[in-house]
């Protein structure tokens, strides 16, 4: 009697019907060397218990490019080897054994030129709810020059904005009108006038002031521009106020933007929550009409703040620069809103660099050539006051808008005095810096000396002193200890 024959399972072929691991379908290639023309993405992933990190990385690559849950024969009708995204590197996250950094390369032909909506539909459209992964976060991206050149970028940029304002050698100053809701058009305009007359360069609508029963948008625009014109005449300076044109439809947003232009406004504003197609459309309108576009990052914290899941703001900032905003809120580090100092400085690099170099301490994982795209003016706003002027200039330099909302309008001597306090503090600090003084360490002394001759600044320092919202940041680099803002 013959011995029973051992039956061995036949190895699976790539296009055999059924379910196959993503890494076996070609979405993992540890030997892959990214091309200069690839779009690169870095994800922080937390695989489910028992899931191989390499398989999880391959799943991210697959689900953000061409894969579905089972083998499909129609892949063979495409240049599938080229169109498959490739996870090519997986690193453990320092001090966090459950998390991994996975690097994914995408062929440039996967993306429509000049469309952030298309880019995001692939990169973040599906993978964040994939069951084998507990959590995923998009930490950084690199775009090839060929892709960057399909975007027009900011219509104005830092240099042209300064030329239009005729203001050089210092940060710009602004304030958000408070309270953000409830004022009548006339009272709103009065707040704007007082702030600009006192020395600010800009006033600003807040994210949720649109057209409500207490103040129709047209009334606000009329009273605000009357205030801007009167303050400009009184001071001899070019002034502006960010008029929020955010509305329920693109048609209505265009209508409000046209009205702002007809009144002589130099700048309009939109909220991040309007979406990428709308942001790019408004950027195109601003380019055609010689207007500055301010972007308030309303809603970003819902997906940027948590370290293990969502999208890092450095990625949002890169998308916004491509999309063509001229201003964007990027954090203060010393204010009331989330922001690790080094991480926030990384956001400023994304806005202002001609070529952003890898800097792991700032959370920048890739070099990025911006291909002569104009630079974005970062905006520091949220819980800052005159007593922090030395910290703000030390952290962010000159090319930034420092917006003191409560730090202007909450001044005990009134709005105009609050604006004057901020302007005097700024000019005293810039002068001291230009004289070679160590403003970070000598800053409090410099402010006290300036306050001897400026009652509004003295009152501001007496009211807020050295108040800083120094909480432990939730979003920090995993490569270095968190720096202190003190």
Curated annotation (Swiss-Prot):
The record marks 336 as: Transition state stabilizer. Pfam families: RuBisCO_large, RuBisCO_large_N. A disulfide bond might be able to form between Cys-278 in the large chain dimeric partners within the hexadecamer. Keywords: Calvin cycle, Carbon dioxide fixation, Disulfide bond, Lyase, Magnesium, Metal-binding, Monooxygenase, Oxidoreductase. It comes from the Bacteria. GO terms for biological process: reductive pentose-phosphate cycle. The modification N6-carboxylysine is found at residue 204. Substrate binds at residues 126, 176, 180, 297, 329, 381. Binds 1 Mg(2+) ion per subunit. Its cofactor is Mg(2+). The active site is at residues 178, 296. Belongs to the RuBisCO large chain family. Type I subfamily. This is Ribulose bisphosphate carboxylase large chain, chromosomal.
